Every structure is written in structure tokens, then in C-alpha cells.
Amino acid sequence: MIDTDGYRPNVGIIICNNNAQVLWAKRFGQHSWQFPQGGIKEGETPEQAMYRELYEEVGLKPEHVKLLATSRHWLRYKLPKRLVRWDSPDPVCIGQKQRWFLLQLISDEQQIEFEACGNPEFDAWRWVTYWYPVRQVVSFKCEVYRCALKEFSAVAFSLMKKSSDKKRNKRPRRASFYKKR
């Protein structure tokens, strides 16, 4: 499904933990890393596509995550000319327009499973600092990543504050080494 401008509708998924770190995934058999993403099928809403792609690419189900935010607008990037398939019988896709989603992982990270659907997109992952992907993603996606991360930054960093507030507000522990003499 390609729009009249040549852009394929797509979803991008940013999964964060309580430390405002984001899941950074390595493309299967390659040296490039990126956020999970994937196309929107005919008749599918962006949110439905996001949950489908989340399971297909990362093995996570809706109950493993909390939806925190959705981008207000479609973010677009053009493919480099060398990646455009000019000889395809389908309409030419010159790039992707993406609706982005910020999710919080609320389950154990052991739930992350790249082979959930038998055809893995990724073969490794790690938690990275929030802005790290902007400097590391392939150059033609850099601006889209910057825009999505910027839009979601207040929400993501509020998680870190809530997490540290919970730690700070725990009942003080008594020192176990103190003994009366």
C-alpha cells in the first residue's frame, strides 16, 4: 500500500524502560541497528499495525507493554535512490511515512523474543541511552528519529523521574550492622 506521493505507510516503535533507555535492535545478519518498524496493511489502523509488528519483530504482546504516546503527525523519510525499486510492477515507493509509538516495557525483558514468528528481523538487542539512536541510525532515517524522540522526550524522561521517586520514597532501612553494646 503506497500513497499517491510514493510513501509507504509504516509504524515506528520506541520501547523504553524505567531509566529512559530505549531498545536498540540489530538487523538480522547485518551491522545496522534500528528501532522496530513495519508496514501498515490494508484495512489496519496504525495502532493495530504497531501491535502486530511489535509481536512479529520483538515477540512482545500488548500485555507486555504500556502505550505512552503516539506521534501527532506522520514523519517521512526518503529512501536513497540506490534503494528505490524502479523496475517493480507495483507503484514506486520512494520512502516511508511513519506514525511513531512510545511504549514502556512493563514485563520482564525475558519476554523479548526475535523468533516469535519464525522469520526474525533482528538478531541482537540492547538498552541504549535515549538520544543514542539519532547518532547511530542510517543517515536517511536520522531526522525522523530525532523528531520522534524529541516529541516523546518529556514522557520518556518522566518515567525515569517516577522510577527514582519510588526508590527515594521507600521506607528507610535500618542499618543491620548497628548493635547496642
Curated annotation (Swiss-Prot):
Keyword annotations of the record: Hydrolase
**SUPFAM superfamilies given for it?**
Nudix
Q: What Gene Ontology terms for biological process does this UniProt record contain?
A: mRNA catabolic process
Task: Outline the extent of the Nudix hydrolase domain.
Answer: 6-150
Q: Which cofactor does it need?
A: a divalent metal cation
Give the CDD domains listed for this entry.
Answer: NUDIX_Ap4A_hydrolase_plant_like (cd03671)
Output the Gene Ontology cellular-component terms: cytoplasm
A Pfam family of the record is NUDIX
Q: What class of enzyme is it?
A: hydrolase
Cite the InterPro entries for this sequence. Answer: Nudix_hydrolase, NUDIX_hydrolase-like_dom_sf, NUDIX_hydrolase_CS, NUDIX_hydrolase_dom, RppH
Say if the entry is tagged with keyword Acyltransferase: no
Q: Where are the transmembrane segments?
A: none
Q: What is its EC number?
A: 3.6.1.-
Q: Is Hydrolase one of the keywords UniProt gives this record?
A: yes
- Residue numbers covered by motif Nudix box: 38-59
MF term (GO), any: mRNA 5'-diphosphatase activity
Q: What family classification does the UniProt entry report for this protein? A: Belongs to the Nudix hydrolase family. RppH subfamily.
Q: What does this protein do?
A: Accelerates the degradation of transcripts by removing pyrophosphate from the 5'-end of triphosphorylated RNA, leading to a more labile monophosphorylated state that can stimulate subsequent ribonuclease cleavage.
Task: Report what the protein is called.
Answer: RNA pyrophosphohydrolase
Per the UniProt record, the source organism is: Psychromonas ingrahamii (strain DSM 17664 / CCUG 51855 / 37)
Upper lineage: Bacteria, Pseudomonadati, Pseudomonadota, Gammaproteobacteria, Alteromonadales
**Gene name as annotated:** rppH
